[in-house]
Amino acid sequence: ILEFEGGVANNAVPDRASALVKAEMAGLKNAPHITLEPENGCVRVRGWGKSGHAASPEGTVNAIGLVVDYLLDSGLCTETERRYLEAVRKLHSSTAGEGLGIATSDGPFGPLTIIGGRMYMQEGRMVQTMDSRYPTSTNGDVIAAAIRQAVGEGASLEDVDAADPFYIEADTPAIRACIDTYNEVTGKQEKPFTMGGGTYARHFPYAVSFGPESHDMVLPSFGGPMHGANESAPVDALLQSVKIYILALLRLEEIDF
């Protein structure tokens, strides 16, 4: 393996990845979501997946995992590379962490998620980044220990950074003030929910992310979705949001924290 690259962010499932390997095109088999190209006497193996956010990997297809599977199944690696790719394959085998022995779930947050965001070469070594959103039923130390055991001598786990889940009970006065205000203004009966994303609320000792989101919002042709290009919202929806924020802030001021 001369080159291996994939992904643009640690917290996103990549939709494309490629590896340049010393091999001949003749004899290599086709595979779903894989393309093969001759390149300077070698072969470029490209994987084509489906991208998504690390906090919600359901329905995604990790292109790095596709390339890893093809290299292993085709024998396009040395013995040392094979041991490493076998370790990486365990990561990509399940976004619930089953391949690494870290799968777990709890009531507030649901199941753990884990994805491989980027693959690159550094000083002759392949580096695979990981991003996991884990519930209250485990912690960073437990996850790291399990991963090290799962990969064995095929790979090393380095630069581990963990932040335990942050959770506030849904029936606390502050949360009730926010959700009741939202329902009162919109006429809906929504309930608060947890998510895997580490929002701006992480920067405060006692906070949650709060804001209106409408899945049935009609946008013009040039309007993009949340976090997408040309993100937009109707003016009426923005003005309604202002009303929600003002009322919620006034009610939060009356609560003794």
Language-model features, listed with the residues they occupy:
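Short, conserved loop/turn and helix-capping segments at secondary-structure boundaries
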Residues: E58-V61, T172, S232
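Midchain, well-structured core segments that form catalytic/ion-binding scaffolds
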Residues: I1-P135
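Generic non-transmembrane alpha-helical segments
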Residues: E24-I34, L66-C77, A146-A155, P173, ...
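A short small-residue
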Residues: R46-H53, S156-D161, F222-A229
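Short glycine/threonine-rich loop-to-helix capping motif typified by GTGT followed
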Residues: P14-A17, I168-R176, Y206-A207
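Zn-dependent metallopeptidase/amidohydrolase metal-coordination segment
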Residues: T181, K188-I255
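Substrate-recognition/cap regions that form aromatic- and gly/pro-loop-enriched pockets
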Residues: M121-G197, L219
